[in-house]
Regions:
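Short coil/linker segments at helix-helix boundaries
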Residues: 62-135, 153-154, 313-353
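Residue at a conserved register position within TPR or TPR-like alpha-solenoid repeats
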Residues: 29, 63, 125, 132, ...
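Start-of-domain marker
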Residues: 20-71
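TPR alpha-solenoid repeat register
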Residues: 55, 108, 157-158, 164, ...
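Structural motif corresponding to the intra-repeat A-B loop/turn of tetratricopeptide repeats
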Residues: 32, 66, 85, 135, ...
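Structural register within alpha-helical repeat arrays
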Residues: 25, 45, 59, 66, ...
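Short coil turns that delineate tetratricopeptide repeat
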Residues: 50-51, 103, 153, 159, ...
Length: 398
């Protein structure tokens, strides 16, 4: 028994001695930047010690040197191709393998430990991901962004890690993969809540598509909390917040956000505010917002269309009152409403503003439908063929 124990001990010592001598040779080559020679020694080390943490750690360091070696070569001559195209991925996997074999493995002097090594790879992976993304190689982009995110997390660089998850979400958007887009955005805001208003806007839209009102509300709440001290970024969320409060019929919060949005003076946002005010039946306030905005941009299509929409909605409200009177057999009241100047004014104004909008953009279906209906109600017949053709063409596209 003792004899066998001695044999095993001797075998362990000889293997350890071999691996250390071998690693010393690799280390010396790397220190003198003899990368191809270091690889030859490393191949021999790995063949004899495939389950040794120190060997895997040195292998990963060799891969890092290979990656840098290629960068230096191609910097001098851009026509060259990488000699070690998989070096950076091999380095990443090598560091992981070393840690899995021995979480306390230590590097030789001047070499990277497993965590430090992965941290060094973060920026290169990020650049590789962006290049792959710009070239339309979505699978590679996702892979490299994923590597970069994990590397940044090891460095406790939460902002950079969150940025990688956000970039992955963008890639998934181009792939129309909303489920994975949502997962990446959730990871991004979990790491850094104020990463970007765009993260919350896209998340809201993803949940809105799923008709998940609860999740939509949670996103709005998280966004308000994340940007509570940054009004400039919170402004970017106003349109989404207005959409949410309008969708759940919360006019109190809707009007509060509308007032803040109007105060920004942004023309597009003012046009949106007018629409929400119109939907909330705040017609006079909607008209004031649009009138103020039109003094700055009198030919703005959204503003002109918004004014037409405002009067059309008022007209429909009036006609709803008439219908209720008819249903209640209050025929005199129904007649009075139908003949009222209020109805005629709303109808005429809806037509005139939609007609102005039509002259700026004749291809908007919603505006064209209202314009045609008002022409019918006002008996401005026949309907122009061009208007009918444009409506029919857009309806066929739906």
């Amino acid at each position: 028994m003792k004899k066998w124990m001695l044999v095993l001990v001797a075998l362990f010592v000889s293997v350890s001695a071999f691996s250390q001598t071998c690693l010393d040779d690799v280390w010396q080559c790397l220190r003198s930047n003899q990368v191809p020679k270091a690889k030859k020694f490393m191949d021999a080390c790995m063949a004899e010690n495939p389950d040794n943490a120190s060997v895997w750690l040195m292998q990963a360091n060799v891969n890092v040197y290979q990656y840098r070696y290629d960068l230096e070569r191609m910097a001098k001559d851009p026509s060259l191709t990488p000699r070690y195209p998989n070096a950076i991925e091999d380095a990443y996997n090598g560091f992981l393998k070393a840690m899995s074999l021995d979480k306390n493995v230590t590097p030789k002097t001047g070499m990277f430990g497993p965590k430090e090594g992965q941290q060094v790879l973060a920026d290169p992976f990020k650049e590789m991901a962006k290049k792959a993304q710009s070239n339309g190689k979505t699978d590679d982009a996702l892979k490299y962004y994923g590597y970069a995110a994990k590397c940044y997390e090891l460095s406790a660089e939460k902002i950079n890690a969150a940025g990688m998850y956000f970039d992955m979400a963008v890639v998934y958007i181009t792939m129309n993969d909303k489920a994975n887009c949502t997962k990446m955005l959730e990871k991004s805001i979990a790491a850094v809540p104020d990463i970007s208003p765009l993260a919350y806007i896209q998340l809201y839209e993803n949940y809105e598509d799923l008709k998940d009102t609860v999740k939509c509300g949670e996103i709005i709440t998280k966004a308000q909390k994340a940007f509570a001290s940054n009004e400039k970024q919170l402004v970017e969320l106003y349109p989404t917040m207005m959409r949410y409060y309008s969708s759940i019929g919360d006019n109190e919060n809707l009007l509060a956000i509308v007032d803040k949005a109007i105060a920004t003076g942004d023309i597009n946002m003012m046009a949106d505010c007018a629409t929400y005010l119109t939907n909330a039946k705040a017609y006079d306030k909607a008209e004031k917002v649009l009138t103020d905005a039109l003094t700055k941009e009198p030919n703005n299509f959204k503003l002109l269309k918004g004014m037409g929409y405002r009067y059309a909605m008022e007209y429909y409200d009036i006609m709803d009152r008439r219908q209720k009177a008819m249903n209640s057999r209050q025929y005199e009241e129904a007649t009075r409403i139908f003949q009222s100047e209020e109805r005629k004014t709303a109808m005429q104004n809806a037509h005139d503003w939609c007609d102005k909008a039509y002259k700026v953009d004749s291809d908007n279906l919603e505006n064209n439908l209202i314009l045609r209906e008002m022409k019918v109600q006002l008996q401005l017949l026949p309907i122009p063929q061009e208007l009918n053709d444009k409506i029919n063409a857009r309806m066929q596209q739906k």
